[in-house]
């Protein structure tokens, strides 16, 4: 893999990290997304972040959270309001990528969400995230999953 491609992947990974933090903050505070984004950009070194992708993830996940929740509810084993805030933010981001970014293989979406959960979540939350998003991928990307298996 070329250094340029590696840098692009790393920039997207960093965008996801900042986005999940912003989504979490929005869930807890309901502060306007533009304020969360502006403060994040001022307070952090963002020169190696895919800023366009960060902006898209943060704004679109928040704007579409009700629709994303509708996708998630059938594959959850508990009520939405019983989820940990980090888990919910990570699941919403993963659901958005599964639904709206078909160019990203579903396994990459799952792997990235698992890494976010390991970094920000509780001890075993990555296992829960994996299970939920795998079930969602079966619904949203059935053909891709069948082809991969």
Curated annotation (Swiss-Prot):
UniProt-listed SUPFAM superfamilies: NusB-like
* Keyword match Signal: no
Question: Any keyword Metal-binding?
Answer: no
Q: Which InterPro entries match?
A: NusB-like_sf, NusB_fam, NusB_RsmB_TIM44
Q: Which GO terms describe its cellular component?
A: cytosol
The entry's function note states: Involved in transcription antitermination. Required for transcription of ribosomal RNA (rRNA) genes. Binds specifically to the boxA antiterminator sequence of the ribosomal RNA (rrn) operons.
The record's comment on protein family reads: Belongs to the NusB family.
Name under which the protein is recorded: Transcription antitermination protein NusB
Organism equals Acinetobacter baylyi (strain ATCC 33305 / BD413 / ADP1)
């Amino acid at each position: 893999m070329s250094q340029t491609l590696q840098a692009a992947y790393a920039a997207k990974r960093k965008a996801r990290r900042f986005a999940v933090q912003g989504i979490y903050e929005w869930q807890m505070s309901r502060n306007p997304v533009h304020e969360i984004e502006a403060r994040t950009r001022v307070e952090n070194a963002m020169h190696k972040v895919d800023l366009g992708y960060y902006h898209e993830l943060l704004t679109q996940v928040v704007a579409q959270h009700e629709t994303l929740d509708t996708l998630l509810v059938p594959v959850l084993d508990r009520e939405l309001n019983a989820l940990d805030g980090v888990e919910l933010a990570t699941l919403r981001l993963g659901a958005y990528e599964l639904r709206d970014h078909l160019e990203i293989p579903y396994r990459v979406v799952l792997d990235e969400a698992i890494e976010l959960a390991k970094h920000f979540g509780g001890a075993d939350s990555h296992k829960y995230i994996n299970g939920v998003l795998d079930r969602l991928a079966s619904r949203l990307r059935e053909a891709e999953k069948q082809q991969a298996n």
